[in-house]
Amino acid sequence: MFQHTVKAPALFAGVGVHTGAYTRVAVRPAAADTGIVFVRTDVSGSDNRIAVSPEAVCKTQLGTVVGNAAGVTVSTIEHLMAALVMLGVDNAVVEVDGPEMPIMDGSALPFVRVLDRAGRREQQAPRRYIEILAPVEVIDGDKRAALRPAEAFEVAFEIRFGSQAIGTQAIDLPMDEAAFRDELADCRTFGFLHEVEALRAMGLARGGSMENAVVIDGDRILNPEGLRRPDEFVRHKALDAIGDLFVLGAPVVGRFEGVLAGHGLNNALVRALAARPDAWRVRTFAEDLAEAV
């Protein structure tokens, strides 16, 4: 019913999957109604703060990047954002001393663990959520993403790849903190070997390895340990979508549907929703309780 922040700083460090740069991160407590704010501690002055919002998303190639008017950015935020929203952390200041969040093991599980160690503190402000009132959909060829009214948060996703290592996979899950922990948090990002080589030629994927991603070569999975789940690929895409939705600034009560969607389409959906005030409203759990009495 109430907003929460972290009880103590959540500290972690690692390499960025694209920059290869080693960065240190501290997720610190923040006042009620702050939302999620990234602070680049390696940038001096007042231009180092980035308040997360749909408009702050400035790039979506292979990850979600947020930035401010001064051009200061932080990339690959989606896994941490998914962990924050699903663990009920509404307000936090995320200090990072470089341009990219650490990829850790490629999933959200390391973030869940550090947030668990930090704990959560209840704040004296009602927790808000975004209730979906009418369907909103964006389509790009055979790709689509949609938000529809529902009694609770639900996530459905479908992917189709020519590689037999992936094929067609689909999930449809009611999503709360327990489901996120049990069904999605440990599912890793993935990529094809030939794409990794091309990305590195473009200056990307410099930190990518089988330590932080599932790597596919043709129809083979190269990671010696294999998959954590048979449908790990589609589950990770659902994890990404949850993180991308949280740039709205509050959890969603509604049904998300994604077909072949990526970060770009997810953000297009968020912006389309924001542009449709008839399709959503901000509610608080306190209001719901009062109406139920």
Swiss-Prot record:
Entry binding sites for Zn(2+): H79, H236, D240
Protein name as catalogued: UDP-3-O-acyl-N-acetylglucosamine deacetylase
UniProt function note: Catalyzes the hydrolysis of UDP-3-O-myristoyl-N-acetylglucosamine to form UDP-3-O-myristoylglucosamine and acetate, the committed step in lipid A biosynthesis.
GO cellular component terms, semicolon-separated: membrane
Protein source organism: Phenylobacterium zucineum (strain HLK1)
Superkingdom of source: Bacteria
Xref: Pfam families: LpxC (PF03331)
Catalytic activity: a UDP-3-O-[(3R)-3-hydroxyacyl]-N-acetyl-alpha-D-glucosamine + H2O = a UDP-3-O-[(3R)-3-hydroxyacyl]-alpha-D-glucosamine + acetate
InterPro entries: Ribosomal_Su5_D2-typ_SF, UDP-acyl_GlcNac_deAcase, UDP-acyl_GlcNac_deAcase_C, UDP-acyl_N-AcGlcN_deAcase_N
GO terms classed as biological process: lipid A biosynthetic process
Known EC number: 3.5.1.108
